[in-house]
Design a protein with these regions (language model features):
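Long C-terminal interaction/binding lobes of large macromolecular proteins
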Residues: 31, 37-41, 135, 145-146, ...
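Juxtamembrane interface helix immediately N-terminal to a transmembrane segment
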Residues: 3-25
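Transmembrane-cytosolic junction motif
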Residues: 45, 55-85
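Acidic, Ser/Thr-rich low-complexity segments on the non-lumenal side of membrane proteins
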Residues: 77-119, 123
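N-terminal signal sequences
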Residues: 22-36
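Short hydrophobic helical membrane-anchoring segments positioned at the boundary
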Residues: 182-255
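A membrane-cytosol interface segment of integral membrane proteins
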Residues: 129-160
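Hydrophobic alpha-helical transmembrane segments
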Residues: 34-53
Length: 255
């Protein structure tokens, strides 16, 4: 059977080779060295070299997965289905929505595959449509994350600490993707701006500055600090060169 054209074969194969190769580099090669090298000093040095190779390949693999999420084509049916559900959207509008989906997938990958919450009704609709095509979605997740990413409904900050952390995590990495300071945002990242931009029914509205809420009488926008939530796990950014996750002033929403 012909493979789906939206998933470049070279992308997928390179990621698979790197994912397998790092485990060959460590611990398999050090075990071989232990039994084949007579000198304990040589074995230790060989193991260190293998460990360095493992780390390099793991970093290369993560880079390839990020590149895949940013550049690999989505299946054509996603845009068409999204326009069926939201007929007010143009082709360029759906492209923006799918770019928001890429931001969400990147947030999951860059947080070391931790739970991330979906902040947009529009992007959630695209995600749900993708999931209904099981084989295509499974293949995408395998190349992007190495395992399946399960669907959770779109939401705003509430009383569930896990979901609040997931939303803050999404905020942090969406901001990082657009070079926005997540603690002092001057604007919203795309993923958090789409529902308001396209007037999505039941969509979520966010503001970049909590003080904006006080200046808007009758506004249905909310700020994350209204719930008294702390930062997401400080270890979220450890694997990607970040400086700790946090929602800052901009993580909020309403429906």
């Amino acid at each position: 059977m012909k493979r789906p054209s939206f998933m470049p074969l070279s992308f997928r194969r390179r990621i698979q080779l790197l994912a397998a190769g790092k485990w060959i580099a460590f611990p398999l090669l050090p075990l071989v060295g232990y039994f084949s090298l007579r000198s304990g000093g040589r074995t230790a040095l060989f193991s260190l070299v293998c460990l360095a190779l493992f780390a390099a390949m793991a970093m290369w693999e993560a880079s390839r997965r990020r590149q895949f999420i940013r550049e690999a084509r989505f299946p054509a049916f996603l845009g068409a289905k999204l326009r069926e559900e939201y007929p007010q959207l143009s082709a360029s509008d759906t492209d923006l929505a799918l770019h928001g989906l890429r931001q969400f997938f990147l947030a999951h990958l860059r947080s070391n595959r931790k739970f991330v919450a979906m902040p947009s009704r529009l992007v959630d609709a695209a995600w749900h449509t993708f999931i209904l095509h099981t084989r295509a979605y499974d293949q995408w997740c395998s190349s992007a994350f190495g395992k399946l990413m399960h669907h959770t409904p779109a939401e705003v900050l509430g009383r569930d600490p896990k979901r609040n952390d997931g939303l803050r995590r999404t905020w942090y990495w969406a901001c990082k993707e657009e070079s926005i300071d997540p603690r002092k945002p001057s604007r919203l990242p795309l993923l958090f701006a789409l529902d308001k931009k396209f007037a999505i029914p039941g969509g979520f509205t966010y503001v970049p500055d909590c003080q904006d809420i006080d200046r808007r009488s009758g506004s249905d926008a909310y700020c994350g600090t209204s719930f008294g939530g702390g930062e997401a796990s400080s270890g979220d950014a450890a694997g990607d060169g970040g400086d700790g996750g946090g929602c800052g002033g901009g993580c909020g929403g309403g429906d």
